């Protein structure tokens, strides 16, 4: 997945915070150290230019409890969780992942597989990728996928539609798109996941099975 529309940060409806610039001295949630929400929180705080403390709060459900009880000022979530609270006017969104310009065109979600498996089962892996691409086409072709997703997750169809159309736009799920690697590697170095950016030959090896 390229682009970053699938995570958002929110406050209770009664909060005086309307943007991160209002949140000096406050706390801002992410899931766990090293997660995408962690990296995004750090980037959002840096971009806001104010002193906000990033805190790990676990799952969206656990985070909502902490926010609504006043333990944390700004919560994080990933749809469909939180859509019902938004619709009910209990919370307000104050930031989204894509507020950081570098994330808008960065590939932020992908499938990974064991190299031994890929070497031994290349045809099977290719079939999986083709099936994934066909499924994505079906998901956005009409309302059948909305009905299925609502049934699977136990949420109303309208919340399923909001989740798909607002937070997972079709353009973000182009499987052949791979972009923003330079910025991603800078983040990886800063987070100490790697010691230095990968060379072109290393990138070619890493993505040799990527769907083209």
Question: What annotation goes with each model-predicted range?
Answer:
Residues 42, 83, 182-186:
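Predominant activation on well-ordered alpha-helical scaffold segments within soluble catalytic domains
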Residues 48-50, 88-89, 153, 191-192:
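Residues at alpha-helix termini
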Residues 186-212:
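Conserved C-terminal helix/tail region of periplasmic/extracytoplasmic solute-binding proteins
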Residues 14-27, 120, 190, 195-200:
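Immediate post-signal peptide segment of exported/extracytoplasmic ligand-binding proteins
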Residues 1-57, 66-69, 73-79, 90-97, ...:
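Short, glycine-/small- and polar/acidic-enriched structural segments
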């Amino acid at each position: 997945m390229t682009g970053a529309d699938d995570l958002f940060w929110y406050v209770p409806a009664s909060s005086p915070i309307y943007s991160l610039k209002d949140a000096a001295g406050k706390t801002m949630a992410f899931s766990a150290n090293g997660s995408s929400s962690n990296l995004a929180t750090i980037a959002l705080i840096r971009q806001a230019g104010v002193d906000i403390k990033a805190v790990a709060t676990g799952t969206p459900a656990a985070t909502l409890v902490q926010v609504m009880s006043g333990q944390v000022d700004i919560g994080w979530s990933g749809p469909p969780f939180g859509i019902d609270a938004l619709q009910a006017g209990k919370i307000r969104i104050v930031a989204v992942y894509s507020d950081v310009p570098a994330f808008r065109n960065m590939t932020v979600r992908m499938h990974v597989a064991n190299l031994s498996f890929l070497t031994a089962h290349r045809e099977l892996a290719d079939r999986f990728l083709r099936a994934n691409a066909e499924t994505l086409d079906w998901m956005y072709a009409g309302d059948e996928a909305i009905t299925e997703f609502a049934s699977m997750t136990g949420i109303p169809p309208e919340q399923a539609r909001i989740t798909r159309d607002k937070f997972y736009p079709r353009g973000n799920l182009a499987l052949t798109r791979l972009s923003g690697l330079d910025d991603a590697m800078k983040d990886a170095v800063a987070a100490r996941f790697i010691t230095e950016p990968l060379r072109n030959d290393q990138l070619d090896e890493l993505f040799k099975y990527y769907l083209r």
